[in-house]
């Protein structure tokens, strides 16, 4: 048996002990849920249950919900994750015990200076940053931002008109991706870009590079399986966020800030300016104000959080309207009644449109971009008879809850009437969570909704959308880490008349 190396007994023993220790390292947490009497799929050494994610988070969560009931345990590598669906426990996790036990989201690898971004920051650091940013998202500030967003709505209409004139079906993600990029770079950095027609613009290139992110990426998976790599990578200055992109944006924001501090007479209302004002406000204690690096981190996280959610949701809405022409017509009638002769929308007129709100809410139910909500348990706790040990990640499977027939009649169907005034009060706020809920919900929720509604109003004033032979019906979701379609959403776009107002 020449292929077996001739090693000393001690060496073989050392090798055997090393393998046993390695196996124990890769499996030592995997008995937790069995010990607690919580069901779930069988984990593999080191990997846990992450291989199931290849079928998509949404599909895996739906299958677990059907198979195991209202609670189950999974393992992301060695990390125990407890899925809960009881609205009372969800309320305790997201609201009642948010500040004391479930303050933080799960850390997801080396992030460098981005650790101070509001979505990533922890404990007192998060509370300080949230309190500094909250005034930026008041209704008064949003009102002032409407004209900024509206100007990109005009660019969107021009681009749609140009594409429609070619007589070819239009890829919704391309069009709304450009709109989303323009609004976010405009409101976060104060730069004016028509990104669809200027794809080489350095801001566009840097932000797009920043957005190439997938939870099933080998780099991300390796950190999930071997969490001890995170501090090593942090020490080596390696980050999940591409360094060339963050470096470009850091320099750009520094330059823009210096320019604005010199030109104090010009009145601006965008996120960057509001954060600069917060830094210099007499009401903000100097030791609590945002540092320049923290300001950059917030601007970058606004891109990260806002681009995909806005562009994808708008694409899903247009698909639903195209495949439900009665809903599209009813929505256009509401828009025309509130804003005759293609009048521009204002903050107050948007709030008057009940049916628009219903359409957006129902689309967010069918396609919640945040498929899961997560909080880390900071100490051993018992909630409604369920013991949750310290260090466990508590996960709310939003997508699965949005399709639970116990809460939604015919959950697969697009029915905006679910969110009518008469029905809205019957919806449990801990079952319908497209933006999360509680103190750590999405801080930009109202901005995101206003942004999407302004785009929809301007587009539907000027165009109607129809399916074409390239449109995938029914829509199929891609298997993978993010909520994306298997094929691009492609629709036929028809001008409602021969002219486009204001474009």
Swiss-Prot record:
Residue positions annotated to bind heme are: 442
Per its UniProt record, the required cofactor names are: heme
Keywords carried by this UniProt record: Endoplasmic reticulum, Heme, Iron, Membrane, Metal-binding, Microsome, Monooxygenase, Oxidoreductase
Q: Which GO terms describe its cellular component?
A: endoplasmic reticulum membrane
Judged by the first EC level, this protein's enzyme class is oxidoreductase
Quote the catalytic activity from the record. Answer: an organic molecule + reduced [NADPH--hemoprotein reductase] + O2 = an alcohol + oxidized [NADPH--hemoprotein reductase] + H2O + H(+)
- Protein name, UniProt field: Cytochrome P450 3A21
Q: Show the taxonomic lineage.
A: Eukaryota, Metazoa, Chordata, Craniata, Vertebrata
